[in-house]
Structures are given as structure tokens and as C-alpha cells.
From Swiss-Prot:
Protein name (database record): Ribosomal RNA large subunit methyltransferase F
Segments of this protein annotated with the region Disordered: 1-35, 225-261
Top EC class, one word: transferase
UniProt keyword Zinc present: no
Gene this chain is encoded by: rlmF
Amino acid composition bias (Polar residues), ranges on this chain: 1-14, 246-261
Length: 345
């Protein structure tokens, strides 16, 4: 049974009557995404009273937080997860990625549309719900955000994998501590980092969809340069839409000597060759698991990587490929989806 968001604040526009296409044109979140407009701090503070310690008033007299304060952003995430997804315990180690929940939720809702339009078509065009839908999250991190959003929004089952033992242990603890997640999410350690699907997808496994938010930097230096730009943009956009702000700043600082102002371990933020190398490996390996997955999908943060990946997928003989654009304020990104079989259509 689908878990419904709790205490969602009404917005001025009837976002549930918008189409996803309209939302993208307007730079807005997916119509089913509950994180529309400004955060309702009164509601969120009721869900997590600790948030009151971090709430401030902006020059317009509106409640907000200091989005440059990693502790405040972390508590805001805890409040969002408690209020909208019923997650009572959520915490991550120092130095690990604290993700922007509104943007992460958008990915899941667009994937639900993809399934509704292709492999799980309902007469009323509603997204498929329930534990018969099994999703695989590649690189779940310590936060397990995609399994949380997907299981609590649509009732799906998730297998979540990562190459980092601390991430796996933390994500598993989050899921085991929350009754709503315990039976819905299984966390697995990838013991051979050179592989993405091998060791994770078993011979008897079938996943309706794979989701992935890949490392997007090729080196620590590139990650640091991106962080510098992000901090500049955070200052420049101060006072604008809060969902956009959290997408720029909602990460926890690490312990590295470089003193990066965002969270994320090496494995979360950068890998040799960057995003294109990781996704090239993912695409090639997906061919070996074509019979085990309905749709392979991934975020592609760099637009210049889309065409090379499309060309590669054509060479690999995929049966169908889609680019799903997402827009959140001034930030645009996209989902690349492909599959090798279309027998279910």
C-alpha cells in the first residue's frame, strides 16, 4: 500500500493538476513531489522540535535556516524525512553526503511515470505501487534517500548497494531502525568496486528499474573547483527558492584537510575518469544483466555526456532509450534511461 505524505503544506498553485511537462517548463518540481514552494517550518518543527534551534527569520519576515550551516541543513533533512516519509531516525557520519531531498524525490517521481508509461501500464495511467515493484539503487550512500522516498511514496521494495562499508552500515542501520523501512529495503555491499551490477544482481533477481546518482567529478581538484563555484552561487542566490538553495548547500562538511564546504567522501563525489567513465562502465556492464532489469536509469549531471552515452548505448544494441529532463528552479539535470527488451509493452 502506498504511503502518503504527511502534513503537506498547500501551495498557491494546484501543483497536482500540473503535468510533468508543464512543471519542467516552469522550472518546478514534479507535480507529485510534496516539496513544493517554501518549507513550512511550523509543520516541520512539529515533526522535529529540534529544528526550532536552527530556525531564523529572513529580511522578509519568513522562517528559514542558514543554508550555509551544515548542521542546520542536516536537521532540516531530518525534519523533512520525519514529516513526509515517516522516518523517525536518520543520521549520517561526519563527512558523508547529506543530499537535497526535493531534487532526489523528483528522480523517483519521474521514474514512476516511466514505469507507468511502459512496463506497468494501468488503465488510469497511475504509477505502479506496492512491493511487486523492485528497484535497485546503485551507490545509495549513507543516506539511503532513494529507497526512503521510493518505498514510502509508492510502496516499492528496494535493494541498495554501495562500495563503501561505512555507507552500507549506516544505510542499513537507518532502515533497520525504522519499521517502515525494515521490510522494504535491503542494503548490500559491493565487494568488488570495479563492478557495478556483478555481486549485487543474483541469478534469480529481477529489478523493474535501476536508479543511480553517479560520482560526477574526475578528481579531488575538480571537486574543489566545483565547490568554490557552488559557494559563490549560494551567496548570489541567497533569499531565492529554498528548494534550490538546499540543492546547492545541503551537504555536510568533511574531515579532509582540504576543508571542503560540502559533504561526501571520495567514493561519493569523484571517481577516476569522472561521470562519463563511470556511466560508460555502467552501460557496458548493463548488457550482461539485460534479462534481470526492466529499465536501467541514471542521472547525468553534465549535458555534454549525453550524446556519447547515447551513441554507446546504440552500439550496445539497446531496444529503447529515453532522456527525461528535470528542472528545479535554475538547476537543470536529466535522467538517461535504457532497456534491452520491450516484450512487456
Amino acid at each position: 500500500m502506498t504511503s502518503k505524505p504527511m502534513n503537506r503544506r498547500p501551495t498557491a498553485n494546484n501543483h497536482r493538476n500540473r503535468s510533468p511537462e508543464t512543471a519542467k517548463k516552469l522550472g518546478q518540481l514534479h507535480p507529485r513531489n510534496p516539496h513544493q514552494g517554501r518549507y513550512d517550518f511550523e509543520v516541520l518543527t512539529r515533526a522535529l522540535p529540534e529544528l526550532a534551534k536552527h530556525t531564523i527569520t529572513n529580511p522578509k519576515g519568513e522562517s528559514t535556516i542558514n543554508f550555509s550551516d551544515s548542521a542546520a541543513v542536516r536537521v532540516l533533512n531530518q525534519a523533512l524525512l520525519a514529516n513526509y516519509y515517516g522516518v523517525k531516525f536518520w543520521d549520517i557520519p561526519e563527512g558523508y553526503l547529506c543530499p537535497p531531498i526535493p531534487g532526489r524525490a523528483d528522480y523517483i517521481h519521474y521514474i514512476a511515470d516511466l514505469l507507468a508509461q511502459t512496463t506497468h501500464v494501468n488503465k488510469d495511467n497511475t504509477p505502479p505501487t506496492g512491493k511487486e515493484i523492485h528497484a535497485l539503487d546503485i551507490g545509495t550512500g549513507a543516506s539511503a534517500i532513494y529507497p526512503i522516498v521510493g518505498s514510502q511514496s509508492y510502496g516499492w521494495r528496494f535493494t541498495a548497494s554501495d562500495i563503501d562499508p561505512i555507507s552500507v552500515n549506516t544505510a542499513a542501520l537507518i532502515c533497520e531502525t525504522n519499521p517502515k523501512l525494515k521490510s522494504a529495503v535491503k542494503v548490500k555491499l559491493q565487494t568488488e568496486p570495479k563492478f557495478i551490477f556483478k555481486n549485487i544482481i543474483g541469478r534469480q533477481d529481477y529489478f523493474d528499474v535501476v536508479v543511480c546518482n553517479p560520482p560526477f567529478h574526475a578528481s579531488l581538484e575538480e571537486a574543489m573547483e566545483a565547490n568554490s563555484r557552488k559557494q559563490h552561487n549560494l551567496q548570489r542566490h541567497r533569499g531565492k527558492n529554498e528548494n534550490e538553495q538546499i540543492s546547492r548547500s545541503s551537504t555536510k562538511p568533511g574531515n579532509a584537510a582540504q576543508n571542503l564546504n560540502f559533504g561526501g567522501q571520495h567514493k561519493e563525489l569523484w571517481s577516476e575518469g569522472g561521470e562519463i567513465a563511470f556511466l560508460t562502465k555502467m552501460a557496458k556492464e548493463s548488457q550482461d544483466f539485460a534479462e534481470h532489469v526492466g529499465w536501467f536509469t541514471t542521472l547525468v549531471s553534465k549535458s555534454e555526456n549525453v550524446k556519447p552515452l547515447q551513441l554507446l548505448l546504440k552500439q550496445l544494441g539497446v531496444a529503447q532509450m529515453r532522456i527525461i529532463e528535470m528542472s528545479q528552479g535554475q538547476k537543470s539535470t536529466r535522467i538517461l534511461a535504457w532497456r534491452f527488451n520491450t516484450d512487456e509493452e
